Every structure is written in structure tokens, then in C-alpha cells.
């Protein structure tokens, strides 16, 4: 039996789950523009109140992947995405964007999926622009960058044009919906390994199980106990690790890796320009909390990508490329590549 928007809404109102295959049907209708804005808003609000299940999220993400413009990476060895949901409210500099250059310098291939700022002071696309990079690369160009340099940035509006269908509804609603947690699940390069930060500890285990349903090989889903959607320096971090088809939860702390606990205020910025300055200081090897948090997150990415034996080993590898300048070299190569591609 087909799942219509009306049936879905009735199911949600009754606090009953929409099964994964039913969610696939529903999302295809929404993405094809077959569901009115009023019904889309009602369904999104209802799912938020009911709380989205693993199957519902996986079904919706499956359809978003179907509709995306894919990036075909030939050599997928050590291919990883470093991504966050955003929305943690802490306004830190672009930690995961900085970490992608570090991870690439240490041997991973990073296919990062991101966008402009929605609630933060600086989105990944915003800081890349002020660093001089062109963010609007086409899928073939992103694949070439990953192959040549080891890093590529996929600007969400280019790879998910169908999102324009629901953008007006989301904008008018002005609240978090399932789409806020779908972005990190819909990497156009289908990276088999992922380091994902989430804004809510309740999402750690959920997103790890969703990634398993979507075919991820390895994943670390993390949320600082302070609400940070990265591995945090300020407190312990809850981790959901997907490996070998199983998910296990545990906690890590900065002290586990020889780092001092440091308040988030040391990482906060007010603009993309301030984020750029902090990012460049890190890539120049300037010691401090900003470098530590990047090394920690890059280390986790290197572990989940299969480059490092564990997070601690990853932190060592990340620190080496930060202090010897290799991470900064990757940034410079990437900026030069994107500018050449943009002006061809």
C-alpha cells in the first residue's frame, strides 16, 4: 500500500512510526513537489514532536541521496567525511573545516560536505571563501581535487538542488526539522567512513544506527557533554562508534590524549574573518586550545578513515603535519586548485 502525505500525517499524529520503505515513498513525493507546503510543514512539525526514528531518518536520507548530484571518487581507500549538524549554539571557529586539511595531509582522503552558516557565525563554505577558495566546484572538479590533493569540498546547494522544493517551508517554519540532521547523512561522494558531530546527545546512537542502515563501513558520531557538535576540549565527549556492523557507545576526554581541558570561549569567533585567522594560526602550528581541538578531531577522522590505529595515534599523526607545515601546504594547494577550476 502506498504511503500518502495524508496517511503519513495521521500516523504521526497517533505517534506511530512511518516504516523506512514508507518514508522513502513519502520523501519521493515531497522532493518531486507533489506535496503541498502546508502538508510538508505539518509532517515536519509532527515528526519533530513525535521524535524521528532510525528508520524514518534512514528512509529520508536514502531519497536525498537519490536526488543528489554524485561525486565519483575512484580510489576510496581512507575516504572520509568530517561533518557536523551545526546548531550547537557555541559559535566556534570552523574546527572540522580546519581538520579536513590536517587529515588529508596525514594520509586520509576527505570528501567534506557543507554549506553556508545558518545559525553559526561562520559556516564551512563561508570560511573557505574568505580563505580564497572557490566553493562552487562541479562534481567532476571535486572528484579531481580529492584525487590530486586529498581533499574536496561539496557545497550543498550544488549537490542537492532539489532542496529548493522545501526551502521556503523550512525558512517560514524557522525551527529544526528532520532536514537539519539529514545533511550530514547525504554525502554526495558516499564516503564510507564518517566523523559526524551532532548537537544533541540523544542523536549519537540514533545517527550511528542510521549510518549503518545507509551502508557506512565505519563511523564516529560525537557530541560533547557541553553540547558541542565536535569532540570537545571543555568536557567529556559521548561517542557512538560504528565498526564491523555494530554500534558501541563510550566517552572520551581531552586528558585521554594529553590535552588540557579548556573552555569553549577560547574557540569562539564572531565572523568568518575571525575564523580564518584562528584557522591559519592552527595551520601555522601555533600551540593552544585551537590547535588541540583540531588535532583531536583530525585524529578521530584519521582513526575512522583507517589511517590511524586509534584516536590517540591519530592525534599524533595530526600534530606532526600541523607542526611541520604539511597541513598548511594542503590548504594552499586546495585554494590554488579551486581558483584554477573556477576560472577555466
UniProtKB/Swiss-Prot annotation:
The UniProt keywords, alphabetically, are: Amino-acid biosynthesis, Aromatic amino acid biosynthesis, Glycosyltransferase, Magnesium, Metal-binding, Transferase, Tryptophan biosynthesis
**Residue positions binding Mg(2+) 1:** 96, 230
Its UniProt entry gives the catalysed reaction(s) as: N-(5-phospho-beta-D-ribosyl)anthranilate + diphosphate = 5-phospho-alpha-D-ribose 1-diphosphate + anthranilate
Q: Which InterPro entries match?
A: Anthranilate_Pribosyl_Tfrase, Glycosyl_Trfase_fam3, Glycosyl_Trfase_fam3_N_dom, Glycosyl_Trfase_fam3_N_dom_sf, Nuc_phospho_transferase
Q: Where does Mg(2+) 2 bind?
A: 229-230
GO CC annotation: cytosol
- What cofactors does this protein use? Mg(2+)
Residues the record lists as binding 5-phospho-alpha-D-ribose 1-diphosphate: 84, 87-88, 92, 94-97, 112-120, 124
Q: List positions binding anthranilate 1.
A: 84, 115
Paired cysteines (S-S):
none
Task: Spell out the family assignment given in the record's similarity comment.
Answer: Belongs to the anthranilate phosphoribosyltransferase family.
Listed under subunit, the entry gives: Homodimer.
What does the protein in this record do? Catalyzes the transfer of the phosphoribosyl group of 5-phosphorylribose-1-pyrophosphate (PRPP) to anthranilate to yield N-(5'-phosphoribosyl)-anthranilate (PRA).
What protein is this chain from?
Answer: Anthranilate phosphoribosyltransferase
Q: Which organism is it from?
A: Xylella fastidiosa (strain M12)
